[in-house]
Amino acid sequence: MKTKITGRYIIGHVDGSPLVFMDGCVIYEEDTIIYVGSTYEEPVDLTIDAGNAIISPGFIDLDALCDIDHAILDAYPGPELAKGLEWSEAYFRGEREEIFTSEEEAFRRRYAFVQLIMNGVTTALPISGEYHKHWAETYDEFAQMAEIAAELGLRVYMGPSYRSGVMVTQANGEQTVLWDEALGTAGLHEAVRFVKQYDGKYGGLIKGLLAPARIQTCTTELLQ
């Protein structure tokens, strides 16, 4: 089926350079774009008038927030309040837990991915916070994310994070990093397993990525 989309601004290319076509159109058949430009005289099966809209290639977001609390935790608190959002030393040494269930994690990812697509992003490198994790992101969590991304048609470069330490706020209010290098090594192995099993999956929508957490929470050995 051949489809024609018309709009006020069409972002295309001519001789390798970007060009804006005013009141232009995009023609595609199945999954292939066959024309971008001002006019198209051949018959089509369906015409969609997008009106006063920008029709462009999908955007690429290499800092794609794929949760719904990241900005609240990372951007808005001042230095003093931010200390209260880090783990305590007691929590680090105690019974840590996953705050969100698997179903809640899936909702957060799906909601975030849909928001990316609604804002024109078709290729994303997801990032998210780790305050609420038992340690870092997991293989199972990212396998679920990959399925959601593929279902929505979003191209993603992804892999579970891994780290050998975590920022904590001590009883005196000072911040430091506490270490568990065994968890860092285990996380790296999980990340490698994800890349091996998911890179190129779902028709190439999933691209595997080794994504260590913040550099101050990784040992030199883990990064190497």
Predicted feature residues:
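Alpha-helical packing segments of well-folded alpha/beta enzyme cores
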Residues: 105-112, 116, 145, 187, ...
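Short acidic/polar active-site loop segments enriched in Thr and Asp
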Residues: 122-123, 155
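Metal-coordinating catalytic core of metallo-dependent amide/deamination hydrolases
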Residues: 135-224
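N-terminal metal-binding scaffold of metallo-dependent hydrolase/deaminase domains
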Residues: 1-42, 53-55
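Active-site gating loops and adjacent loop-to-helix segments of metal-dependent hydrolytic enzymes
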Residues: 71-105, 134-137, 165-184
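Residue-level "edge-of-site" marker
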Residues: 129-130, 162
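Divalent metal-coordination and catalytic microenvironments
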Residues: 8, 26, 31, 52, ...
